[in-house]
């Protein structure tokens, strides 16, 4: 086994300083192996594993680059010169005789975007932090979700752009896709991001432990699967364990795969049935279609993309039709069979009749469930239901001092929502200063933030705040302004004029309370919409803001103008 150098910030080589271990030494997670000198200063390089060092592959004073092998080691289950187990191990696999006991201010369980951001923020505020992760840092988002999916989508987007090169006066003949290299790039991005997170946690003096954590009734966190095990007495505990794909009973056929398996499968099938037209399903639909796969989406609901703006969904539906993606709504899958040739037959009910569809593979994208150990939660006295761990308005569970953030609390399944919730929890733990007196306001009530949402179809959708449908249900009187990208100069330059920007204004206060962009750069425009809503901007305040020309963001300004005097570059 090898211990490699992680990501070196700035891209320049580091210099090896004092080597703190010798061949034959037993090392534990968090133990300093080597001191390094980088452009960011002197940093200790710490072990993330338990094992015995068998070879030192670097010399003091030598240059080190990202990915260089620094040490070779053997794990606890072999070759350490004793009985095949590490120090303090018992005679049975997975059972530790020695237990390390630790005290910390905050114990964070889960190293995804909720957990690691919480840990970094807490450490930056001066708290002692322990982060426990059973798998890889970055969680689902970095390893099996947001990041790898968007890396593949970027390759698909470039491939699609090259096929349209003639529109821009460029000849690009004999374009070929090397899927191994496409997936290698995806894997490299994930690997570099993991190394970056590890570097940041180490630099912030966050103790990282690999293992499975369980909260005990006295707010002690027990960690197993490591050697040794750990008992961590924490002042506060943050549960950030994320979620997992839901796989119905009919999806147990070998022809079915979930999103995790799809991201590891380097072959693009010639045909694919996707069950579920939510965000994950539709992003994969556009991804596979871009690489030449025949895609058929089957959705139980009578609309796609959940609660997304209906007008934006219509833009995506038209784009899907143009790309040859078939979508069947109001359809219930009943069973999936594998044929002798290894292909799939999906049976589904629609309009009172049974239908059958054939494809090489089936991708199941019907939703995600919270990742939680129900038995352990019951033993600890922490309440939960099928949506996730129950929390109050301050994200605190039924056990005082224990919080749940991100997917596991069932509120909103977005990585940036988990990060925002984690930061809010730490602010609540520390208290906030009163601006007038300078004193501390202990345990401030957490205010629900405006969480933007992005869907990486082609074109994209970005939204924030309330939708028109929500406003109707809540009897909020609003005025709506829509500006089409056909009237935006930058959209025409990019050759992407589908879609629009929509702003929703509360009539009485004239505050912007919602917005949606469907079209080019919508993922970036979602942040612009969130800023306007979070800061209670009115149509006047937004329209007085100067937006650079030519940019797609001008569509936001035009929509704001449409709420009062009227759009400048568009008239219905």
Q: Each predicted region: which residue ranges?
A:
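Acidic, low-complexity mobile loops and tails
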Residues: 1-35, 44, 84-85
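Glycine-rich flavin
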Residues: 85, 93-103, 120-127, 132-268, ...
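Short hydrophobic core segments
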Residues: 107-109, 213, 231-242, 274-275, ...
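FAD-site-proximal beta/loop scaffold in flavoenzymes
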Residues: 254-270, 358-439, 524
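Beta1/beta-strand and adjacent pyrophosphate-binding region of the FAD-binding site
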Residues: 97-114, 268-278
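Flexible, glycine-rich terminal cap/loop adjacent to redox cofactors
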Residues: 109-114, 118, 123-135, 140, ...
